[in-house]
């Protein structure tokens, strides 16, 4: 591992995070006032709906990093190049099926939301969804290159690229909004920048990393191993969608776009909160995979878990206390008094969410050791309970009901069950 790459990558992760959150804090209230509460709710509902297509990745993203890192550490170049070819084929097929599923969703939008949305609102929703579907289908085969870059432990380039996109995107989106293109223009610009970013990553892989893509031999034994590994990542992805996207769908169906907008503001703060923990945790999967390949001791891996966990604990508790003290007043000034319920909704999730956010490196360790199956099974059961609890609670308490169901689920899944598992398996 290049220590300089890792250290600079960590610094850039937090620079990127700071800039992203700062831009969002400045940009979100402007956007709310330019497109209105209802259209903001429509945009977030579309994001949640199409976001479900992201699970069509089937967990192969983590598999790219894990197995490419393994072949790099073993200096198996031919296997690495054929692995790249295999993933290109897999992701192209997934992109095609994503397009088909997306079109099915698009066709059924009127049936799902005609009772709680006006004709104009449905038109905006369908246009946004159509754009997002095509972007999702294209992003699958292009997305492999960002995973390859991480496998080579080149942390600086993707972080710098991310910082640039975070600066450019809101500027162009703002120009689009003030010229009257609304949420549709906002989505179009995000898609264009996303595709350009993926193309730049692809060029970096070929020109700088000198990777090759070969289709000479499809290794069915490694494919079987990858599918088994990825399946439980896929289950975890479904769980994440149930946790973080289903509430908007339920509220959109039961309460309409305005309630979705309020809940989305609360979700924005949850995203900020999560990002401070996950900013560097994604960098550890290739590192831990190579440590295991070289037969480093469990004690060394456990020390990484504890060290990073302590740092994350200090960061997360500092942020949480700050939000408890000033969050309510900030939301009313920042977004408007009509969003004041977002404070209590956010806290119902943020407080229990602190538990898993100080243990994010643990997931990388479980994946590297192929011990992530148990976590996926537990989370799936808890997520289903959360889903069925959210519906009646949403009818009683709107957004607060959904947040309460999510918070209780996190306490059971992460606070009780997974803590016990980490104690037994990662110590």
Features from the language model and the residues they span:
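Hydrophobic alpha-helical transmembrane segments
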Residues: 16-19, 159-208, 229, 270, ...
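Interfacial segments at transmembrane-helix termini and the short loops linking adjacent helices
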Residues: 107-131, 323-354, 400
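Interhelical loop/hinge segments that connect adjacent transmembrane helices in multipass membrane
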Residues: 1-6, 123, 184, 201-244, ...
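Membrane-interface junctions at transmembrane-helix termini in multi-pass inner-membrane proteins
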Residues: 3, 7, 136-164, 184, ...
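Transmembrane helical elements of multi-pass membrane transporters/channels
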Residues: 9-24, 189-201, 205, 220-290, ...
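Helix-loop junctions and terminal segments of transmembrane helices
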Residues: 58-74, 151, 209-210, 266, ...
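Interfacial/gating helices of multi-pass transporter permease domains
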Residues: 31-54, 183-188, 222-229, 251-271, ...
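Signature of the first transmembrane helix
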Residues: 5-70, 98-103, 135, 170, ...
